[in-house]
């Protein structure tokens, strides 16, 4: 019963938000609205500067380790389960896999974006 109430509530809230989005007035883009704002001054250069590929790789590596933390956060609750050996084994395998990946990136000089 609780599942049905949750699904019904989520469906109704989603439908309500979609209907409100259709009823809201349409916004129109014009040159002043789409230009970058720099403290009241005219823009000096382009706001679309390219990123270094090395910086992008470091950012992706950071996201992977952030995902690892998100996956390991529920571990204290999982340890309270009956079969903790499998949970700990999978957690250690994930940590070892990410440590090997970090070591590989380090050896390949993938973490240095200054060069």
Swiss-Prot record:
Annotated localization: Mitochondrion inner membrane
Signal peptide residue numbers: none
Entry EC number(s): 7.1.1.2
Broad class of where this protein is predominantly found: mitochondrion
Native organism taxonomy: Eukaryota, Metazoa, Chordata, Craniata, Vertebrata
Catalysed reactions, semicolon-separated: a ubiquinone + NADH + 5 H(+)(in) = a ubiquinol + NAD(+) + 4 H(+)(out)
Keyword Metal-binding (UniProt): no
InterPro entries to which the protein is assigned, alphabetical: NADH_UbQ/plastoQ_OxRdtase_su3 (IPR000440), NDAH_ubi_oxred_su3_sf (IPR038430)
Species annotation: Loxodonta africana
GO molecular function: NADH dehydrogenase (ubiquinone) activity
Name listed for the protein in its UniProt record: NADH-ubiquinone oxidoreductase chain 3
PANTHER family hit by this protein: NADH-UBIQUINONE OXIDOREDUCTASE CHAIN 3
Family: Belongs to the complex I subunit 3 family.
Matches recorded under Gene3D superfamilies: NADH:ubiquinone/plastoquinone oxidoreductase, chain 3
Protein function: Core subunit of the mitochondrial membrane respiratory chain NADH dehydrogenase (Complex I) which catalyzes electron transfer from NADH through the respiratory chain, using ubiquinone as an electron acceptor. Essential for the catalytic activity of complex I.
């Amino acid at each position: 019963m609780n599942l049905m109430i949750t699904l019904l509530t989520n469906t109704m809230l989603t439908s309500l938000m979609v209907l409100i989005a259709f009823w809201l007035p349409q916004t129109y883009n014009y040159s002043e609205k789409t230009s970058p704002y720099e403290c009241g001054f005219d823009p000096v250069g382009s706001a679309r500067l390219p990123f270094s590929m090395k910086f992008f790789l470091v950012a992706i590596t950071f996201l992977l380790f952030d995902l690892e933390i998100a996956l390991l956060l529920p571990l204290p609750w999982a340890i309270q389960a009956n079969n903790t050996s499998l949970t700990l084994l999978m957690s250690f395998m994930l940590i070892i896999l990410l440590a090997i990946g970090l070591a590989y990136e380090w050896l390949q000089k993938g973490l240095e974006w200054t060069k």
